[in-house]
Each structure stands twice: as C-alpha cells, then as structure tokens.
A protein has these predicted regions:
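Short hydrophobic beta-strand segments in globular cytosolic domains
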Residues: 127, 133, 145, 150-151
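Terminal amphipathic alpha-helical/low-complexity segments used for targeting or macromolecular assembly
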Residues: 1-14, 19-20, 85, 91-92, ...
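Flexible, glycine/small-residue-enriched loop-and-beta-strand segment within the central core
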Residues: 24-136, 163, 171-172
Length: 212
C-alpha cells in the first residue's frame, strides 16, 4: 500500500529531508529546485496517492504525524508550514503565491508573482477540496469545511467554511441550549433520587413494629 520513497526528486544536496519514517502512497511527487527549494517532512507523516509537493523556491515543512489524503497539491515559492498531527483530506490545493495581472498589455505569465507565507497550525483538519491561498494563517485546532477557500487569518480552534472561509463557530464555545438541557436533566435526576429516598424511608418506618 505504501512505499517509503517513490518519485523522490533530489535536485540539490538535502533538498528533500525526512526526519524519520515517512509513508508515501503511489505516484507521490516530492520535488525541490536545486539551490532554491527545500522540503522537510517530519516522522510518521502519511502522504496518500498522487500527491504533488513542489518547492520551486523557499521551503515546505510538514509536521510529525500529519496525514494527507490523495490528489493534493502544494506549491511553494516562499514558505509553507503545516503543523503536527493535521488531517489533510483529498484534492486540496495550497500555495504561497499569486500571479500579477495588473497590466492588461503584458501577458499574465510575464508579469511575475507576489508571495506571502502560509501557516497551518497543529491539529488542523482541512476538508475535501479546500484551497489555501497565499498569506493564509490557520490557527491550531481549526476545522475548515469542504470546498472552502482560505485567504487570510482563521483564529485558533475555529470551525470555518465558505468562499472566502469565515468562522462559523468556535470549538471552545459550549452551546447554551445544551447546557440548559443538561442542567434540567440533572435537576430532574436529583428530585427523582430525593423522592425515591423519601419513599424508601417511609416504607422502612411503616414496616418497623411498635415495641411499646
């Protein structure tokens, strides 16, 4: 099911570095441009089939125990870091650059690019077909819904979705209604226990013979 090193391109000394055992699926591409790019994959990372991770320039870091699905693409020209123990679902695109297109008289491909780093915190879950664009910061413990486009800051412990992705709720917020239902249930349980104790006490008193 997994190969340790499949289609692993070393375009320069230590261009691709694995700090421990790494699981690579079929058709995985890891490429770093000689003298410009570097990929660092920490131990116990799982990368699924047909993923393409390319450091054209700059660096890509994938933290320990992160799991990636299949058909994902990461393109870096500056710096992309993914924290430890993240869940990266299928068909995700992540990049740290955009093409300039301000001059209509010059072909877009000739106008150069603009770059900003991407930061994905630890314990983040990216749903299927999420796009993470340049300059994005996704805080630790956040969940991004399927088909969302992330551009900018997502606070830690957020549940976010949409185009562009916006916070729907915080994982730290306890639903007030759930708290009220639980409090009511506990109150009912206390009253029930009290009533049963009274019934048991009365029954015991009635069954005790009068010795006077």
């Amino acid at each position: 099911r997994y190969w340790r090193f499949l289609k692993l391109h070393h375009f320069g000394p230590r261009s691709v570095v694995c700090t421990g055992f790494v699981f690579l699926g079929k058709g995985v591409e890891l490429s770093a441009r000689r003298g410009y790019g570097r990929i660092i994959i920490e131990s116990w990372v799982h990368i699924g089939d047909a993923c393409h991770i390319r450091a054209h320039e700059g660096s890509i870091l994938i933290g320990t125990k992160t799991v990636m699905g299949r058909d994902n693409t990461i393109n870096a020209y500056l710096d992309i870091s993914i924290g430890a123990q993240c869940i990266i679902s299928d068909s995700i695109y992540m990049c740290d650059f955009d093409h300039r297109f301000s001059d209509p008289l010059i072909p877009i491909r000739s106008q150069g690019i603009v770059k900003s780093p991407v930061r994905v915190g630890a314990d983040v879950w990216l749903g299927t077909k999420v796009s993470v664009l340049r300059g994005s910061q996704i805080g630790q413990g956040s969940v991004i819904g399927a088909n969302s486009v992330v551009r900018g800051l997502i606070e830690p412990m957020s549940v976010a979705a949409g185009v562009p992705a916006k916070m729907i709720k915080s994982r730290l917020t306890v639903d007030r209604k759930s708290m009220e239902v639980e409090a009511h249930g506990e109150s009912v349980r206390r009253r029930t226990r009290h009533a049963l104790n009274e019934i048991s006490g009365n029954a015991a008193s009635e069954s005790t013979p009068d010795i006077n």
